[in-house]
């Protein structure tokens, strides 16, 4: 789909008012491609799944003349909801995409029925140098195919734009991330791969405590991109969460 102003993939049946869609939000500089395994599993169980490349990233690079900030990306997602008539949706985000999802839920609460934050980044009060070090430490913990996908996405998005997005995301993390999380009223599941070096266990538990109705889960054997390396476990957690089950 490209008639929404930027590129998005759709899996499963067309959206219906009586069945909330699922929107998957990628991390910094990436595309939605690393969400495809999870999208296919959710769609196989009847979900309508929309996976955009956010404006300025990958196949949507031309949709923004410069790197958008977090609030602009959240507003772009709100526009996607309206253009596709998605209504209140389950929003699943990874990494810096969690900042975008939190801003969406805070700025446009009527569009988010439930929220799943996978490896939320960037952690406030952690310097850019330390954040980058955490990213490097995570690299050997991820599947090789994911590293190839990420590298090719970064090249398409462009190193300079990735760097600009990183600095904008750092500023949002320091100024707005926790503020937005505290404004989230949708039930929220915070998921962390047990081997994630980017989103610490202490931070993910704090995220779950900041939102009005939050809970945290770990996925053993996974790292930062748990949705990619453990899509079956992630899909099971999401489906349990959307069914209203806890614990």
Regions found by a protein language model. Give the residues of each.
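Alpha/beta-hydrolase fold catalytic core
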Residues: 1-22, 44-47, 86-87, 156-157, ...
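Conserved HGGG/HGGXW glycine-rich cap/lid loop of the alpha/beta-hydrolase fold
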Residues: 11-59
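Conserved acidic catalytic loop of the alpha/beta-hydrolase fold
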Residues: 71-89
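Flexible "cap/lid" loop of the alpha/beta hydrolase fold
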Residues: 99-107, 111-142
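Hydrophobic, aromatic-rich cap/lid helix
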Residues: 150-177
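Short beta-strand/loop motif that positions the catalytic acidic residue
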Residues: 184, 190-192
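Acidic catalytic loop of the alpha/beta-hydrolase fold
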Residues: 194-199
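Catalytic histidine-centered segment of alpha/beta-hydrolase-like enzymes
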Residues: 222-232
